[in-house]
Amino acid sequence: MQEIFLCSISNVRSGDCKEDCAYCTQSSHHQGAIKRYKFKDEKVVLQEARALKQLGALGFCLVTSGRELDDEKCEYIAKLAKAINKEELGLHLIACCGRADLEQLEFLRDAGIHSYNHNLETSQNFFPKICSTHTWEERFITCENALRAGLGLCSGGIFGLNESWEDRIEMLRALASLSPHTTPINFFIKNPVLPIDAETLSADEALECVLLAKEFLPNARLMVAGGREVVFKDNDKQEAKLFEYGINAVVLGDYLTTKGKAPKKDIEKLLSYGLTMATSCH
């Protein structure tokens, strides 16, 4: 039976990002109707971690909004990592905090963070069409820094931004050059506050994207993330094909600013597809 890895996200700092990423409701340029707060209370994050472990998940990603890591964010994430690891839950801790240099990433590694998530999002050629406040090259360098720091790299992208198939191939080729241990696959969902006017991908096209990702990243853990609920709706037959086509990890529960599936029901559905829950990240 195929094993599936479960991961969950905690949006530990939300909103008021000065970047203008056209796909993100956390950008202050778009005025999305989202919750905004500076830092989530440590006790709340610990409760989330314990609940996640009870569900059988292995990965826990701590996400902060904003362009990059700074001293305050570094100290906050390090404090959370130490507190979670003290609980001995056996969770694989991932930080996702934007652009970061080598010294910052080494600091997080020493504090107990295991991996760093920084998505390329799309191709180098298409990126300027969805963001003008930082470059694709900056993203790529941060990914390289994570590897140099001895962290696991989690890096992927978004499909359905009006990019071409050539853009998809270019992004996947760039990701392959980084050899990430995990590649999140997101599907863009249209939102009236966002400037991207793109229709939601069909389930068939989304599955083609997964097949393409598997071709370029045969050894990466392919993790279906944002957009799964909308693209596949209640079409169990099509959703089950995700795992036949190469997906072997799932984001459980809510995303940064959008609702996901109810975790317990989602796990029941995954088990009905003949999948088993992985018990180790290795």
Swiss-Prot record:
Binds 1 [4Fe-4S] cluster. The cluster is coordinated with 3 cysteines and an exchangeable S-adenosyl-L-methionine. It catalyses: (4R,5S)-dethiobiotin + (sulfur carrier)-SH + 2 reduced [2Fe-2S]-[ferredoxin] + 2 S-adenosyl-L-methionine = (sulfur carrier)-H + biotin + 2 5'-deoxyadenosine + 2 L-methionine + 2 oxidized [2Fe-2S]-[ferredoxin]. The keyword 4Fe-4S applies. Pfam families: BATS, Radical_SAM. GO terms for biological process: biotin biosynthetic process. HAMAP family: BioB. This is Biotin synthase. It comes from Helicobacter pylori (strain P12). The lineage of its organism: Bacteria, Pseudomonadati, Campylobacterota, Epsilonproteobacteria, Campylobacterales.
